[in-house]
Amino acid sequence: MKNISEFSAQLDQTFDQGEAVSMEWLFRPLLKMLAEGDPVPVEDIAAETGKPVEEVKQVLQTLPSVELDEQGRVVGYGLTLFPTPHRFEVDGKQLYAWCALDTLMFPALIGRTVHIASPCHGTGKSVRLTVEPDRVVSVEPSTAVVSIVTPDEMASVRSAFCNDVHFFSSPSAAQDWLNQHPESSVLPVEDAFELGRHLGARYEESGPTNGSCCNI
């Protein structure tokens, strides 16, 4: 089975294409704003990233995975206000994540402790975690694992990657799913957390920029 560095290198290469490229400057600021629990206006994104409002609007229109409300405000991009199986509680606010790995990666990017609850994709048994920015505090059950896929392309982050990244209560609970997805793997939660830290590092220095296409 691949180690964390191999998974990280392959996913980094995949994330360097398609929709994921715009996440370099957009993702972390947007994630922090979504963590407040309210829809995010385009004007707020522009102010936070240093991009013109029209440029932010244009980029959002190119992202097939982004979730918008009727007013054009962002309500989901990795972290979402819409219910998913992956419950993500931060500062008493009930939010949701697109996939299991998101729940492990996002605490470091938003700088907050998060309480996570997600059903085992194989049995429905609840998997519960508390994750701080720099460590996994608790996992119940302790045998829980995370499925990982390495798609060849990432035109849509959610459909190509997130929709196949689940929690399982144990490796045995994941076996039927693995039999149906032979190119996939599972990692213990601690290893998946480290993989998330590797992948999240590309966004950690993102901040206001005055550039244009070269930063997209």
Curated annotation (Swiss-Prot):
The keyword Lyase applies. It is an enzyme of class 4 (lyase). Keywords: Lyase, Mercuric resistance, Mercury, Plasmid. It comes from the Bacteria. Its EC number is 4.99.1.2. It catalyses: an alkylmercury + H(+) = an alkane + Hg(2+). One of its GO terms (biological process) is response to mercury ion. GO terms for molecular function: alkylmercury lyase activity. Cleaves the carbon-mercury bond of organomercurials such as phenylmercuric acetate. One product is Hg(2+), which is subsequently detoxified by the mercuric reductase. Belongs to the MerB family. This is Alkylmercury lyase. It comes from Staphylococcus aureus. The lineage of its organism: Bacteria, Bacillati, Bacillota, Bacilli, Bacillales.
